[in-house]
């Protein structure tokens, strides 16, 4: 996409679980709590649980960065007791298929309307880790600083090897 790790999507692309909404559109930035969940939510998003393969076109132009949060962020919790407080089950919000994104985006819009900086939930594809979405009109790029000591560029041999080691037990082949 050509964006920096802390640069927001201004509303381009297909609808996602929690974006897009607003007029004008609220820019969003998705993030993950760990490298594995970042890969699971992006590169492996459409790979069946039974396994599959990633082709070079799927990963060679992808990079991963790490962000450091530089201020307290108020996040709507779409997990645990946060779901209970909302009176909704994960199956109806964070675990839905894409055909229900029209519904799930409304929850994100409501969190935005209530003044939250973003939302947090358990990753659907790596449910031991948290996933995040930040609202670009509330959290600036300066609030999420790129860690200069970390990067993965999946065009580099060492990072392709890391990706391969991660994916082999998941029955996902990395085609080169």
Named regions from a protein language model:
Residues 1-17, 48-176:
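Active-site and NAD+-binding cores of ADP-ribose-processing enzymes
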Residues 18-50:
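Extended catalytic/binding region for NAD+/ADP-ribose chemistry, centered on the ART fold
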């Amino acid at each position: 996409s050509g964006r920096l790790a802390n640069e927001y999507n201004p509303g381009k692309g297909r609808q996602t679980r929690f974006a897009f909404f607003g007029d004008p559109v609220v820019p969003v930035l998705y993030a993950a709590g760990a490298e594995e969940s970042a890969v699971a939510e992006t590169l492996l998003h459409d790979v069946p649980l039974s396994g599959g393969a990633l082709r070079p076109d799927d990963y060679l132009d992808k990079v991963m960065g790490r962000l450091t949060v530089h201020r307290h962020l108020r996040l709507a919790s779409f997990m645990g007791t946060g779901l209970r407080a909302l009176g909704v089950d994960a199956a109806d919000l964070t675990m839905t298929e894409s055909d229900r994104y029209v519904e799930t985006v409304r929850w994100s819009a409501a969190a935005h309307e209530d003044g939250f900086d973003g939302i947090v939930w358990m990753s659907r594809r790596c449910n031991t880790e948290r996933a995040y979405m930040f609202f670009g009109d509330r959290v600036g790029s300066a609030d999420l600083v790129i860690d200069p000591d970390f990067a993965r560029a999946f065009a580099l041999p060492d990072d392709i090897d890391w990706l391969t080691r991660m994916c082999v037990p998941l029955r996902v082949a990395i085609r080169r």
